[in-house]
Design a protein with these regions (language model features):
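A conserved amphipathic terminal alpha-helix motif
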Residues: 1-4, 128-168
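Hydrophobic ligand-binding cavity/cleft-lining segments
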Residues: 1-52
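Short beta-edge strand/loop motif at the mouth of beta-sheet-based domains
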Residues: 20-21, 40-77, 165-168
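Well-ordered beta-strand positions in beta-sheet-rich domains
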Residues: 20-24, 55-57, 79-81, 108-110, ...
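A short, structured loop/turn motif at beta-sheet edges
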Residues: 29-30, 61, 85-91, 112-121
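Hydrophobic pocket/interface hotspot
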Residues: 32, 42, 66-68, 84, ...
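Helix-adjacent hinge/juxtasegments
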Residues: 65-98
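Beta-strand/loop substructures that line and gate deep hydrophobic ligand-binding cavities in soluble
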Residues: 96-148
Length: 168
């Protein structure tokens, strides 16, 4: 119920808690969406440049969870957890993302996939619980740059998938 109320809020109500990142990816929404659905895909592109991802468990369904570790280029490991709150194939994915299932600082993200000719415009809209948490994510964890790099990695991976599908 709380997330529905937040989402229904006006843009100005969340502007100081929100990060929005978008990119046009040269592939159809169905293929871009597919890259989120399985470990074999996610482990190839998830995270900023220089990071790798190890999945402990993944259940891609509404209410399902993804428990994983992001390995930073400096050797630091970051435990991560996502619960999928809404999935509309090739259109929308909503999630709660934190360090663990009980993380009081978990944040909400919504990804939308919009057809743009033969390409897809993906938008990642993240809302933090407080403006201070958004600021910390931007300054300490470089959330904007990391998000842009993650979508760049997704674009490169999906281009490889599209090329392989074209050959097959």
């Amino acid at each position: 119920m709380a997330s529905a109320g937040r989402e229904a809020g006006t843009q100005s109500e969340v502007a100081d808690r929100e990060i929005v990142i978008s990119r046009v990816i040269d592939a159809p929404p169905e293929l871009v969406f597919e890259a989120f659905t399985e470990v074999r895909h996610l482990s190839q592109w998830w995270g900023p440049n220089g990071f790798t991802t190890t999945t402990r468990s993944l259940e891609f369904r509404v209410g399902g969870e993804w428990d994983f570790v992001m390995h930073g280029p400096d050797g630091t490991d970051y435990s991560e957890w996502i619960r999928w709150t809404e999935i509309v194939p090739a259109q929308r994915i909503a999630m709660l993302h934190g360090e663990s299932r009980d993380d009081p600082n978990a944040f909400e993200s919504v990804l939308t996939f919009e057809r743009d000719g033969a390409a897809t415009r993906i938008e990642m809209r993240t809302v933090f619980p407080t403006p201070a948490m958004r600021q910390e994510a931007v300054e300490k964890y470089h959330a904007v740059e990391g998000g842009q790099q993650t979508l760049g990695n997704l674009a490169a991976y999906v281009a490889e998938l599209a090329e392989r599908e074209g050959e097959g």
